[in-house]
């Protein structure tokens, strides 16, 4: 049996220490070539070296997805190095701004929308010529909070930007379907990886309670006893990027240990 992404070339945006790194590692593990993009070259080099020490199945380029020319350059690198693009997985996002409407800095909101919404669309459009030649897949990493009220952390701007992407997914799926390009979204809930680990540690320190207590607040809401991990979300993205999802488009897949079901 062939590997899930055997011979496929996948652009992964937002490759840092967390989910982006895990997605790129999963692509290579499953037989594909990963083309890594992120703003910081040192992070890209570190990820590529860990994932693919001999450099056979990875390439990378510093990329700010708010810059259309940089998106085009990353797509061109995939074409030059591996001969095409079979999928794009959008992990890059601005997710470090907290708060709701009443205290909103709309200038920051505009920047978040420019990265999370328009940046994803820029990167998708940059890859379209290659995707049209191959047929293929666009996988957006969204968030459960785009479709349901969050319980612990208020990130209204982030949720709004990802909710807009979920709506854009439907239009793109319809527009690009005739070219055999599928567009889907993975919606993680609480995901055990560096950001959530930091949240648990910070909250425990702030409240003066054990980390296990904070962790239990999260898992108590799940149908399954363990939080999803970065690896679980990466596996879902790899499936949607693969030919085994050839008849799936315009869909949102929750990866959340059953916290929200729909």
Regions found by a protein language model. Name each.
Residues 9, 16-17:
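Conserved glycine-rich cofactor-binding loop
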Residues 62-73, 106, 232:
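The beta1-alpha1 cofactor-binding region of Rossmann-like NAD(H)/NADP(H)-dependent oxidoreductases
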